[in-house]
Amino acid sequence: MDENVLVKNLLPCVKEAGSKIIDIYNSKPNAEQKYDGSPVTIADKAAEKIIIKKIKSLCPSIPIVSEENPESHNLKSLSEFFLVDPLDGTKEFLKFDGKGSFTVNIALIRENEPLIGIVYAPAIKRLFYAGKTFGSFEENKDGIKKIRIRKSDKNKILAVASSSHLDQKTKDWLVKNNIARTVSIGSSLKFCLVASGEADVYPRFGPTME
């Protein structure tokens, strides 16, 4: 399936998953603990169900590696697969602070390279999507616009940092590079702020899950 067509077919289900997450968010659910000790809620599971069903209907032959399905993590040597995190930023989700820095994420990976990527922050209604062949876009209340990274002024560099993984190595790097301006935010929104030209760099030295 053409990448652009695939993204257009996936966007409605991403929004549906986001709506389900917000419905559950408003009820302030309790968290359970995953196999790795990290939190998981019924919102993670409900969003995953919506996304997996849609992907299987569109591309039944392509395997799906999902954050909430540990068995899928054992799939090895895949040349092509969907990578899904139905609720990235569960810790931010569970703060119920109204900031909304949690996201729904889908990517299609082929030969270790992303072909498409979708990130949706339902609480603030910002939707980002990109494809290797058609560029990067944001959809929000004002419509759809093409996005791009910005040209950095070395004296005004803005770093975006993790709200839950800001370690000493990152702090030292910021000092070493004379970066005094930072914004702290959770989830994959950090990448989106760089991609849309709202920030310049996202330093990450800690472990990163696939």
Predicted regions and their residues:
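Solvent-exposed strand-loop boundary residues in beta-sheet-rich modules
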Residues: 140-142
